Amino acid sequence: WIVMRDRHGVAHFTINDHQRVHQCGKFGLCGICGKPLGKHVKGNSNKGAFFVGGPASFYHDRGAFLDPPLHRECAEYAIRVCPYIANPSYGKRIDDATLKPEHMPAGMAVMQTGGNPPNLDTRPNVFILGLARRWEMFEPRPGVILFKVPNHRRDWVHLSAWRHGVELDVESREVKDEIFRRLMAAATGGV
């Protein structure tokens, strides 16, 4: 639902529609289907909402997500079919290279969120699907909307690791914790 569409209606899956991302955060809508997540997803509820991202988004003190919260079914769909996440041989640039300036919708501009666009060199080797009790939307600078979980040590209810669109078979909580500790160390350079 947040995928940017050009003047001809062509979807550009590597570009988010800023207005829709904002609507998701403000009104509690799923970033994939655009339907309400339900009143239980904000605040201190135990129900929560799902996020997909690399280990640093989940475990780093400043970790955040570009994509808004999702329904469980929508999150699992995304983690299974998104080429950047699920396809190990995906080799395209992950930025605005697919959008011709003359096809941009009226009144819309494409801006990078900072640094180089994600590419195969920066793609995590494992992605995480997480259920958060609470989440917040914030705008660190005009035009950039991010989502974060207030207390990443306490607010994650469930986490699962995925590689190439398949959930990793990890049985015990102790093994999961060790895997996530190692993933976080790798994602932050051992910090």
Question: Over which residues does each language-model region extend?
Answer:
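Short, flexible beta-strand-to-coil junctions
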Residues: G34-K35, S45, G54-A56, A132
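Short, flexible, mixed-charge glycine/proline-rich loop motifs
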Residues: F13-F27, D61-F65
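A structural/positional concept
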Residues: I2-H8, F27, C33
